[in-house]
Amino acid sequence: HCLKYGLTLHNVLQVRGFTAQGEPISFGAEALDAPGYDLLSLAVGSEGMLAVTLEVLVKLVPKPQLARCIMASFDDVRKAGDAVAAVIAAGIIPAGLEMMDKPMTAAVEDFVHAGYDLSAQAILLCESDGTPEEVEEEIARMSEVLSRHGATAIAVSQSEAERLRFWSGRKNAFPASGRISPDYMCMDSTIPRKRLADILLAIAEMEKKYQLRCANVFHAGDGNLHPLILFDANDPDQLRRCELFGADILETSVAMGGTVTGEHGVGVEKLNSMCVQFSAAENAQMFAVKRAFDPQGLLNPGKVIPTLQRCAEYGKELVRGGKPKHPDLPRF
């Protein structure tokens, strides 16, 4: 529900901990603002690479009095994508705005029997929460926008049990995918909302290119994709094609104005993709920040920043039989 309530960054007021050298740090404050650079945002977004966190002060919000959910069917993914953009353009910020394509809908319906329209090419789940009066007005406005942009069917939850049933398919998308494929790789990228249909059509072409199926489920409201590439990890060639497929999705997302991650982070899986999104100079600047906080490279070494030389710089390069890896590449 970060579309309405914000990301982790927007809900953390203060972080306390220690650097790798044992120096105490404190970023942010209990007050709404703090002087100096916004190091709190830097710490929250660092994936544990800059400091060891011991204490986090978070913002709490009241639990809404009521929540209701719209389930809308579309006979075309472009119409569904356009409807997502239209909801936001109308000044409506739903508590949740999720989308599933036909393969994913079929998988979850067989698993949890949520009552999804199996003839639909895409399904949107749009949730409104707040006071009963606010919810009633917002549900009516969203229904009107969805109808105007091609929804073939619209159902509105009339009870808490029905709302949970609508959501049960979305929340069980990953385990449902495990029923239709031995393995799957979940990707995580973000694109502008207006390109939702474009990326889905591009992924459909990639399915043909790599000869692998893909089921799509994602946080449509903020353009955060979670394509699930279906494959068999016991087949080395399928694994190879799956990894290429995933990298292609990330590169295409960047080309469409998006990013290589939305919420899962970079870690080691997306190191190469960081070179697609950022220039060598930009990656070097991020590495400089890392060195300033952690000069010995003790915290999450080898993560996020794609620079080979750091392994040699820190004396952590693995050498077997006196032969370093990639001897042709420059080192310091």
Task: Give, region by region, the residue ranges found by the protein language model.
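Short, hydrophobic/aliphatic alpha-helical segments
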Residues: P24-A43, K208, E243-G257, F287
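C-terminal substrate-recognition/cap domain of FAD-linked oxidoreductases
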Residues: V58-P62, R68-F245, T252, M256
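Intrinsic disorder at enzyme termini
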Residues: A281-F332
